[in-house]
Design a protein with these regions (language model features):
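C-terminal and inter-domain tail/linker signature
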Residues: 1-133
């Protein structure tokens, strides 16, 4: 399979996240994630089924907003916000992926509760250009 351009990979990742996290369409999302998906997150059970089950069990209001996608060959990183996750605060996430055969094959993440304006020592929001309400 020919390697995607960085722009194609970015579009692929954004479509994958929208399909799974915003539309909650696990059946359609299966075309983005490898059957042999390797999960390194401490918050998600193994395999793509662990990820899909997590999303299906999450509140209906779960949403993903993307801020940045970086691509280097078969490695990619996304910076975004998961809101409506059933927690008091949205999670700001850095998700790292390894792609194989054009699919999401391996995943690592770093998650942090989004800080309010009162909590931010820098005085700047963690995501976007304004603090959460």
């Amino acid at each position: 399979m020919a390697q995607k351009t960085p722009e194609e990979t970015k579009a692929f990742l954004l479509e994958a996240f929208d399909t799974l996290f915003n539309r909650r369409d696990v059946e359609a999302a299966a075309r983005f994630w490898s059957k042999d998906y390797i999960q390194h997150s401490a918050h998600i059970a193994p395999g793509r089924e662990g990820l899909f089950n997590l999303v299906l069990a999450a509140p209906e209001r779960l949403r993903y907003e993307n801020d940045l996608v970086l691509v280097d060959g078969d490695d990619a990183m996304m910076h975004g916000r998961f809101s409506g996750n059933g927690r008091p605060r949205a999670w700001i996430a850095a998700d790292r992926f390894r792609l194989k055969d054009g699919l999401l094959h391996e995943h690592w993440d770093v998650l942090q509760d989004e800080a309010t304006a009162d909590e931010s020592k820098s005085g700047r929001p963690m995501f976007g250009d304004h603090f959460p309400a």
